[in-house]
Amino acid sequence: MFSSTFRRLAIRPLNRVTMVGAMHDIQVGFLDRCSVFQFTLTCTVLDFQKVAEPQPKSPGSLPSSTRTAPNPNGEEVEKHINKEQYTVRCLGSEAYTEALKNYLDDGCIVRVIGRLKTTEVVDAGKKQPFPCIIVEQGRWSTVSLVHSLRKQRRDWQLQNILTSVATLE
């Protein structure tokens, strides 16, 4: 009984990440025989830490990325705004990468669901791990447009094109 139920369930990847951020440094090319749409995703991370000693109240004395604010418990909390950058590689057919290229521009806010993969890159004679998020066409991964300055909420058009490309193949 369990095996028949198990066969009907779709096996999903264990390594799955969801990121929201601004995209920039867009590149289009080929990796082996697969078409690639690659960009850098910049995510803003807000980190709260308790302040051990009282901080000065003037906002000019603190760096621009650090502010103090009262916590609901009445404690002083220091907020750090950090920016993290991730490389995203969208792999698929040429029609898939062309659709992404036509609808996504620099500065767009996107949601990325994909698989985190680490590759080794040789830099100055040393091998260094290089993490990137892999978005494969039709593999429980997606790139969705959240906000664009030039195109007002055209995510439905992007998703329609991507699904039509998937059904053609």
Swiss-Prot record:
Keyword Mitochondrion: yes
An example Gene Ontology CC term for this record: cytoplasm
Signal sequence, start to end: none
Region described as Disordered: spans on this chain: 54-76
Protein name stated in the entry: Uncharacterized protein Tb927.8.680, mitochondrial
Classification via InterPro entries: NA-bd_OB-fold
Residue ranges with Polar residues bias: 61-71
Localisation per UniProt entry: Mitochondrion
Transit peptide: 1-91
Keyword terms: Mitochondrion, Transit peptide
